[in-house]
Design a protein with these regions (language model features):
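Residues that line or immediately flank small-molecule/substrate-binding pockets and catalytic motifs
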Residues: 31, 239, 351
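Active-site phosphate-binding and catalytic loops of NTP-dependent enzymes
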Residues: 2-5, 26-37, 90-98, 115-122, ...
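Conserved glycine-centered short motifs in functionally critical loops
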Residues: 52-56, 60, 64-66, 110-136, ...
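P-loop NTP-binding catalytic core
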Residues: 18, 29, 68-87, 122-130, ...
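Phosphate-interacting basic helix/loop segments used at nucleotide- and nucleic-acid interfaces
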Residues: 29, 33-53, 89-114, 154-160, ...
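Charged, low-complexity terminal tails
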Residues: 1-123
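Charged, low-complexity intrinsically disordered tails
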Residues: 142-277, 284, 377, 398-503
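Loop/turn-to-beta-strand initiation segments
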Residues: 102-106, 208-209, 260, 343-346
């Protein structure tokens, strides 16, 4: 299995694609107009206690207060299992008022970004990640990634890390990539995390709440930290400034992977070269075709994600049971990739086609669970229910691909979605860049680019995205003009170049 990390950067957004064995596995986006707080640590202030929910709301300085449930409060009275450790929850459940009070300052970390009308989800179980280790400062505990299966290696890591934990009275978790890692790099990681924690403790004592005390890494550095490993063959970056910043980061924190860092300078945009743009477009469609003619229909709602498996009339020979089994098996192997690609999380209900034979159901379930084992996000998968459904969950920390790129459709009362005006603006700017690069000689004397688009898209260009428009125009030495067309749906547009400045 080979992996490549493709990093596409411009003035208005950063996109990172993970390619596994030639197929797009994950897509991450960070826009200049957006902000993700996941991973950030804040000194917050309790502003409201809700006993009925066993929760509090905490002001951390964002637009909306964060939500902190009692189960996410680190306490000597109640230590529940979290996503990183393996400590079982106790039966003691003290009242929320015995843990916190109004106006109390508290150190919290964002585990889920705001979504819809909900504020950020918070925890007091601080976890700070480095390349090989995760520091859990409030837990005197050594954890080893479950993906490290070799018993001798687990024992080696535990015996080496335990004295450090006892000395500092802080917990630590060995990440999957620490499998076989030299003790020197593990010590460097541990010392880095201790310095970060010391800085957080100092700032906490010297600032007033609400305030931020730790900021998660920029998207490109964070993904290099979290995704680059032994199977990574290449890290390609198409922006020189970003390339130099990443190289500087890797020289300090991941020097062993520096030979795999590559500056992409081809005229063909990097996402076009690797066919990523088409994969992103297909990932926004509800229907996914399966190899034998069946399909998945994926629908995302506020409450859950539903996945329906269909044969689409495909029949292999005369054995209907075998046809259904084959379609379900293909679906089970496809679903884990679709969850990662679309970044779907929360409760997921899968409606497989009914199978008569128990062994077929078990094989389908085994294939699904095997695919989920490769997912870096925490997942849980139950058995088939009496209704033939499979209920599973996937940890959700950030918006899904659809929530990032699309908005609810105003023509169907929110039951569907269309590409947002913001996403359309980003696509138009990328397209102008790409067409200019592919026709550089022809466009060298071009003075005007005419864009025909929906009124909402043009309105955004003249307001929120005006600075990005000006940057592109200056970079390409090209005047960009607009022709509104209300009949064009957001997500569609037309671009043409002209040397007639009177247009």
């Amino acid at each position: 299995m080979s992996e490549e990390l493709l990093i596409n950067v411009n003035s208005f957004e950063t996109r990172v694609a993970l390619i596994v064995s030639g197929a797009l596995q994950e897509i991450h986006m960070a826009r200049s107009s957006g902000y993700s707080a996941t991973g950030n640590i804040y000194l917050g202030k309790v502003v409201r206690i809700v006993p009925g929910m066993q929760a509090v709301f905490v002001d951390i300085g964002l637009d909306r207060p964060g939500f902190l449930h009692a189960a996410d409060i680190q306490s000597s009275l109640m230590i529940a299992a979290d996503d990183l450790g393996d400590v079982a929850p106790t039966k003691t459940k003290p009242n929320i008022r015995s843990l916190l009070h109004d106006g109390q300052t508290i150190l919290v970390q964002v585990v889920k970004d705001p979504l819809g009308k909900k504020g950020p989800r918070l925890t007091t179980r601080i976890a700070i990640a480095a390349k090989f280790l995760v520091l859990t400062p409030y837990k005197n505990h050594v954890g080893i990634s479950q993906r490290i299966e070799n018993d001798d290696e687990r024992i080696r890591l535990y015996r080496w890390l335990r004295p450090l934990v006892e000395k500092t009275q802080t917990g630590v978790i060995a990440r999957t990539i620490s499998d076989g890692a030299d003790e020197r790099v593990l010590l460097e990681d541990f010392e880095l995390l201790q310095r970060i924690w010391s800085t957080i403790q100092y700032d906490t004592k010297n600032i007033k709440a609400p305030n931020i005390v730790y900021t998660e890494l920029p998207i490109q550095n964070r993904l290099i930290r979290d995704l680059v490993g032994k199977t990574t063959q290449r890290i390609a970056v198409d922006d020189q400034t970003t390339f130099l910043r990443i190289r500087e980061y890797m020289q300090t924190y991941a020097p062993e992977f520096l030979p795999r860092l590559y500056s992409y300078q081809d005229d063909v945009p990097i996402f076009e070269r690797y066919a990523v743009e088409g994969e992103i477009a297909r990932a926004l469609e509800p229907t996914v075709s399966l190899p034998s003619g069946g399909s998945l229909v994926i629908e995302q709602t506020e409450a859950l994600v539903s996945i329906d498996v269909n044969t689409n009339g495909f029949v292999s020979g005369a054995d209907l049971e075998e046809t259904v089994f084959k379609t379900n098996l293909e679906a089970a192997m496809s679903i884990p990739r679709q969850l990662r690609l679309r970044n779907l999380g929360g409760i997921i209900v899968i409606d497989f086609i009914d199978m008569l034979e128990s062994k077929h159901r078990q094989e389908v379930l085994a294939a699904l669970k095997l695919g989920l084992e490769k997912d870096p996000c925490k997942t849980f998968c139950d058995d088939f229910s009496q209704l033939g459904l499979v209920l599973m969950s996937r940890k959700r920390t950030r918006k899904s691909l659809e929530q990032t790129v699309c908005v609810p459709c105003d023509k169907c009362t929110g039951t569907g979605s269309i590409v947002s005006a913001e996403s359309t603006c980003m696509e138009i700017l990328r397209e102008i860049f790409a067409r200019h690069a592919l026709n550089e000689e022809k466009c060298a004397g071009t003075r005007v680019c005419i864009v025909t688009a929906h009124d909402a898209v043009i309105g955004r260009f003249l307001d929120e995205d005006a600075k990005f428009l000006a940057q592109v125009s200056a970079t390409l030495n090209c005047v960009i003009k607009f022709k509104p067309n209300p009949a064009i749906v957001s997500g569609y547009f037309d671009i043409r170049f002209s040397d007639d400045s009177a247009l």
